[in-house]
């Protein structure tokens, strides 16, 4: 179920304070563990280092990202592909 419009988007207060302190066109990377925060128009043009559980992934915010969550752009799992079928390889030889 989607979040109610009357509540507005969720942004951690400490993250919002960091964004307002930096200014609109800052080159400094803002480190955050807040994957749950929604990207607002204030974040456009800023670079965030979003934690994925192991390391910080740099995320440059563009207009298309507004309304999405920070965590969507820092994947937590690495997909190595499906295991190959060993039986079919043995029959071919």
UniProtKB/Swiss-Prot annotation:
SUPFAM superfamilies noted in UniProt: Ribosomal protein S19
Cysteine pairings via disulfide bonds: none
Domain of life per record: Bacteria
Molecular-function GO terms, alphabetical: rRNA binding; structural constituent of ribosome
Keywords: Ribonucleoprotein, Ribosomal protein, RNA-binding, rRNA-binding
UniProt GO cellular component terms: cytoplasm; small ribosomal subunit
InterPro entries: Ribosomal_uS19 (IPR002222), Ribosomal_uS19_bac-type (IPR005732), Ribosomal_uS19_SF (IPR023575)
GO biological process, one term: translation
Cross-referenced Pfam families: Ribosomal_S19
PANTHER family recorded: RIBOSOMAL PROTEIN S19P FAMILY MEMBER (PTHR11880), SMALL RIBOSOMAL SUBUNIT PROTEIN US19M (PTHR11880:SF8)
Family in the record: Belongs to the universal ribosomal protein uS19 family.
Function: Protein S19 forms a complex with S13 that binds strongly to the 16S ribosomal RNA.
Protein name (Swiss-Prot/TrEMBL): Small ribosomal subunit protein uS19
Taxonomic source organism: Geotalea uraniireducens (strain Rf4) (Geobacter uraniireducens)
């Amino acid at each position: 179920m989607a979040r109610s419009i009357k509540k507005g988007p969720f942004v951690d207060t400490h993250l919002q304070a960091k964004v307002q302190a930096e200014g609109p066109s800052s080159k400094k990377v803002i480190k955050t563990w807040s994957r749950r925060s929604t990207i607002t128009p204030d974040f456009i043009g800023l670079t965030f280092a979003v934690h994925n559980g192991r390391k910080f992934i740099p995320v440059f915010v563009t207009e298309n990202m507004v309304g999405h969550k920070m965590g969507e752009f820092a994947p937590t799992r690495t997909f190595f592909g499906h295991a190959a079928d060993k039986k079919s390889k043995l029959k071919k030889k």
